[in-house]
Amino acid sequence: MKDKKKIGLILMYLSFGIVMAGLGANDALRGVFSPIFKDHFTLSSVQISMIIVMSYAGNLIFLWAGTRLADRFEKKKVMMGILLIWMIALLVYVTTDNYYVLLITMLFTMGASTLMNTMINLFVPMYFAAPGLIVNTLFFVQGIGTTGSQMILGQVATGFSWWQKTNLLLFSLGLIGLILFLFAGKKAVVLKSETTDAKNDFDSASKAKPKVQMNSPILWLLVLVFGFYFIGEHGVLNWLLLYCKDQFGMDSNQASIYLSMFSGTMMIGRLVMAPLVQKWGPSRSIQIFGGIGTVLYAVGIFCGKPTLMLVGISGLFVSILYPTLLLFVQQYYPSSIASTATGTIISIATIFDIAFNLLFGKIIDQMGYHLGFMILPVSMIIFYLIVNFLIKKYKPLRKLGKN
C-alpha cells in the first residue's frame, strides 16, 4: 500500500512538473511571437495590445468560473477537463492562420493555463506532506519552461510556422501530463491530516453549494494583497525593458540584462528558498522574503540607474511570494470552498493587472517614465503593508506547514 501511494505521488509530481513546464512556456509565447504576429498579420500596436488584454480577460473568466466548478464537482475531473480545454485550444493554434481566431483562442489558452496553475497549487496540500517545498519547486520548473522557451525561441523562431510547431510540442507535453495524472489518480492517497470533507471535496462530487462571503474583510484584504503584488511583479516583467531604454537611454542588450536578471533570480529563488518556505510556513515566509524583496525592489527603482541591479537581485526573494500566497489564501478558508475563494480573489485582483496595463501608457505620456514607474515600488510597499496587517489581525482557520 505504501509503495503504491509513493508511486502515485511520484507520478502526480511528474505530471504536475511536465504540465507546469508547458504552462511556463505558454506564458512566454506572447512576448516571443509578438513581432512575428505583427509582421505576419500586419497588425497595429492596438491589435497587438488586444492579445494581452484577451489573455488577462481569459484569466479572469476562467478563474472565476473554473474554481467554482472545482468546489462543486470532483476536482480531478475538473482538472482534466481544464487540461483538455488547454490542449484543444493549442491544436486550434496549430491548424489555423487567422488573427481573430488567434485572439479568441488566446482567451482559452491563457485562461486555462492560469486556472491549471491555480488548481495544481490547490491539489498539492491535499497529497503532499511538504506543500511549501513542492509548490515552489513546481514553480521553479515553470520558470525553466518560461526562460528556456524565451532563450531558444528568441534565437530560432523566424516565422509563423514556429508558432505552430511550438504549440504542437506544448500539446504533446499536455498529453503526457494527462496520461501520468490518470495513472497517479489511481494510486495517490489524500493525506490523513486533512479532514474527511476535504477528502470528499477532492475525490468525490460535492453536492453542497460552495459559498464565499463577499463582504468578508479577509477576502478584500487578500484581493488588495494580490492586486498590488500583480502590479509590482508583472509591471517589471512587462515594462522594465522600455523603462531602461526610454528613461536611461540603454540599448536593448543593456536593458535586457536587468530583465533577465530579475527573471533568472525569480527562477533560482523558487528552488533555493523552497526548503525555507516549508520550514517557516506561508505567513512567516511572506513576511521575511516579502520584506527583503520589497526593500531591494523599492530602493532599486527609487534611486534610479545606479541601483537598478537591486531590482534584479530582488527577484531572488520576490520569487516565492506568488506560490506561497496561494498556500496562504487556503489557510483562511475551509477546504470545501478553498478553490472558490482562491479563484474569486485572484480573478478580482486580475482587474488590477488589466487596469494598470490599460492606463500605464497614458500615465507615462503625461507624467514621464521617471514618475510613472514609481507606481511599481509604491504598489509593492502597499502589498507588504497590507499582508502584514492581515497576518497580525486575522488568525488562519488551518495551517499548511509551520507558521
Features from the language model and the residues they span:
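Helix-breaking motifs and short loop linkers at transmembrane-helix boundaries and internal kinks
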Residues: 42, 74, 95-100, 129, ...
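Extracytoplasmic
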Residues: 12, 17-37, 43, 117, ...
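Extracytoplasmic gate region of multi-pass secondary transporters
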Residues: 30-31, 217-260, 264-267
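Helix-loop-helix hairpin linking two adjacent transmembrane segments in secondary transporters
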Residues: 131, 137-189
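Conserved MFS/SLC helix-loop-helix module at the cytosolic interface between two early adjacent transmembrane helices
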Residues: 61-97
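Intracellular juxtamembrane helix-capping segments at the cytosolic ends
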Residues: 114-128, 320-333
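C-terminal transmembrane helical hairpin of 12-TM major facilitator-type secondary transporters
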Residues: 280-328
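A late C-terminal transmembrane helix in Major Facilitator Superfamily
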Residues: 332-369, 376
